[in-house]
């Protein structure tokens, strides 16, 4: 149920107007991009979410609502309410673990997602790379960072192997191990893009695990594993730049030192930070 209003409302107003029987239970602060809170009434639970990035356009939050509205409940929470700065979705019962599931199980989830109808908007990385450069702390910008940005701008993004709806933030903290199987939460970066971009973006523990995930996916998708791995590798520089830039952007927004540490580690992987 989308509800349009130009006037933001408070949490208490949201609950009293739309969920008067519900009461807050707990707050989640998992992940690097923010939190949400849980409301409950007679055993029924919903998650109340706000935009993780206060500077992002409202259209980005609306896209997340639209993505959830068209995804099957077997892989994502169903949304119940959208209005400015607020979204209410189903709570997914299950375990959120600190490590990825078996690669074959994860490959099955991603392959099923990629078989769904496209969302209708493309993920393009270059505008984000340029935004993060522009919005970062000037003292943190380096010649190497700018050089890599120009190199990617000239090279352009890899041509998609297959264009599908993507989640784009697959890591252990966004996977719910439910009684009916794996499900994904936090769809704020969802959009249409290359399946290899999704696979490249998974937060794996090591290269061996990454290769196995790609191999398992290739078997399901009937793609030569070597061909898919080559395409995944083409996205690596783009994703490292995306991660490094996002950490720098969040550092300037929040002043949280964890983002500096994560950015420095990412730049070391790219060998562009002196």
Curated annotation (Swiss-Prot):
EC number: 2.7.1.89
Pfam family, one: APH
Pathway: Cofactor biosynthesis; thiamine diphosphate biosynthesis; thiamine phosphate from thiamine: step 1/1
Keyword Transferase: yes
InterPro entries per record: Aminoglycoside_PTrfase (IPR002575), Kinase-like_dom_sf (IPR011009), Thiamine_kinase (IPR014093)
Reactions catalysed according to its record: thiamine + ATP = thiamine phosphate + ADP + H(+)
GO molecular function, one term: thiamine kinase activity
The keyword Manganese is assigned to this record: no
Entries under SUPFAM superfamilies matching the protein: Protein kinase-like (PK-like)
Species name: Shigella flexneri
Role played: Catalyzes the ATP-dependent phosphorylation of thiamine to thiamine phosphate. Is involved in thiamine salvage.
Gene3D superfamilies the UniProt entry points to: 3.90.1200.10
Family that this chain belongs to: Belongs to the thiamine kinase family.
Keywords: ATP-binding, Kinase, Nucleotide-binding, Transferase
Species classification: Bacteria, Pseudomonadati, Pseudomonadota, Gammaproteobacteria, Enterobacterales
Top-level taxon in the UniProt lineage: Bacteria
Protein name, UniProt field: Thiamine kinase
A Gene Ontology biological process term: thiamine metabolic process
């Amino acid at each position: 149920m989308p509800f349009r209003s130009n006037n933001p409302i408070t949490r208490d107003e949201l609950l009293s107007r739309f969920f008067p029987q519900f009461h807050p239970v707990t707050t989640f602060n998992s992940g690097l991009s923010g939190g949400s809170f849980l409301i409950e009434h007679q055993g029924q639970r919903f998650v109340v979410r706000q935009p993780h990035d206060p500077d992002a356009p409202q259209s980005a939050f609306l896209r997340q609502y639209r993505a959830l509205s068209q995804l099957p409940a077997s892989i994502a929470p169903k949304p119940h309410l959208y209005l400015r700065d607020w979204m209410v979705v189903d709570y997914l019962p299950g375990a959120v673990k600190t490590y990825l599931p078996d690669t074959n199980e994860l490959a099955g989830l991603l392959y099923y997602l990629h078989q769904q109808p496209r969302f209708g908007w493309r993920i393009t990385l270059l505008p984000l790379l340029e935004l993060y450069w522009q919005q970062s702390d000037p003292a943190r910008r380096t010649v190497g960072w700018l050089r890599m940005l120009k190199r990617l701008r000239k090279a352009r993004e890899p041509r998609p192997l297959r264009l599908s709806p993507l989640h784009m933030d697959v890591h252990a903290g966004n996977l719910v191990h439910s009684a009916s199987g794996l499900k994904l939460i936090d769809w704020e970066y969802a959009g249409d893009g290359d399946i290899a971009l999704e696979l490249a973006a998974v937060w794996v523990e090591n290269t061996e695990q990454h290769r196995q995930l790609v191999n398992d996916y290739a078997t399901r998708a009937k793609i030569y594993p070597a061909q898919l791995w080559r395409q995944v590798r083409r996205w690596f520089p783009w994703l490292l730049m995306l991660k490094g830039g996002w950490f720098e952007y969040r550092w300037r927004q929040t002043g949280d030192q964890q983002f500096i540490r994560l950015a420095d580690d990412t730049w070391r992987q790219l060998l562009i930070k002196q």
